[in-house]
């Protein structure tokens, strides 16, 4: 009786095995088989005690050279210290903009463009020329003084200006300087004026030397006329084929 029960159970197992081989339950079991529990790489490093440092895994060249250069100084360089502390070597002092931003201050105002930089100094420092001035060291002012006469050079105001300033119709007496002071003040202007007495005398001697020679001269031309008369008396004026020599030829002997 026991043997019959064992045989029946064996047949049942064979039937179930045949059904499992032909059906899908075996494929699902094979696919859902749990694999080995492999932890991630970081977990493995942490378990082995080699947790990665936050800095670079390969030390910089400065650190390698310092480690290989034995005996090295007692205090390592700043780059080696930063790498040993787990910090990447960076600039020790931040830029000025970063410092201002960290302190809550706004950075410097932007630099103005080049045209504005060129325009601002000219408007600020360029000298303003007066209407009567010119860059050529006051030549226009000298011409105005010459055209106005010795009164403008000596600084004496005119009668019309006095009337306009006072508002009265009566002509004001012109302010006169003493004879010596007035002569000293007006002498430079008098010498520069083209219509002065000395200029007229020089021009008369050059343009009318025949008249001065015949009539004896007038004003400043008397000396030249007397000299020509003396030369004519000596016969020096008749040395060019009986023709009268001009003044230049007489004085220099260059010809008729």
Swiss-Prot record:
One of its GO terms (molecular function) is toxin activity. The keyword Cell membrane does not apply. It is found in: Secreted; Cytoplasm, Cytosol. Residues 149-199 are annotated as: Disordered. Pfam families: ANP (PF00212). Expressed in venom gland. Residues 24-30, 41-43, 61-63, 78-84, 96-102, 114-116, 122, 128-207, 226-234 form a propeptide. Negative results: does not bind to type-1 angiotensin-2 receptor (AGTR1). In the N-terminal section; belongs to the bradykinin-potentiating peptide family. This is Bradykinin-potentiating and C-type natriuretic peptides. The lineage of its organism: Eukaryota, Metazoa, Chordata, Craniata, Vertebrata.
């Amino acid at each position: 009786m026991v043997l019959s029960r064992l045989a029946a159970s064996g047949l049942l197992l064979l039937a179930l095995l045949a059904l499992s081989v032909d059906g899908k339950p075996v494929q699902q079991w094979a696919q859902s088989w749990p694999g080995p529990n492999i932890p991630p790489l970081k977990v493995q490093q942490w378990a082995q005690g080699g947790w990665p440092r936050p800095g670079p895994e390969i030390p910089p060249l400065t650190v390698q050279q310092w480690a290989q250069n034995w005996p090295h100084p007692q205090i390592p360089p700043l780059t080696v210290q930063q790498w040993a502390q787990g910090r990447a070597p960076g600039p020790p002092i931040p830029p000025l903009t970063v410092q201002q931003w960290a302190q809550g201050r706004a950075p410097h105002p932007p630099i103005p463009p080049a045209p504005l930089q060129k325009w601002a100094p000219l408007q600020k420092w360029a000298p303003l020329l007066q209407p009567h001035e010119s860059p050529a060291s006051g030549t226009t002012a000298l011409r105005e003084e010459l055209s106005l006469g010795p009164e403008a050079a000596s600084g004496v105001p005119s009668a019309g200006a006095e009337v306009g300033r006072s508002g009265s119709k009566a002509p004001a007496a012109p302010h006169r300087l003493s004879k010596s002071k007035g002569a000293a003040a007006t002498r430079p202007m008098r010498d520069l004026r083209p219509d002065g007495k000395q200029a007229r005398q020089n021009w008369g001697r050059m343009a009318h030397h025949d008249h001065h020679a015949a009539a004896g001269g007038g004003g400043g031309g008397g000396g030249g006329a007397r000299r020509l008369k003396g030369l004519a008396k000596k016969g020096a004026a008749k040395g060019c084929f009986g023709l009268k020599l001009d003044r230049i030829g007489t004085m220099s002997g260059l010809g008729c």
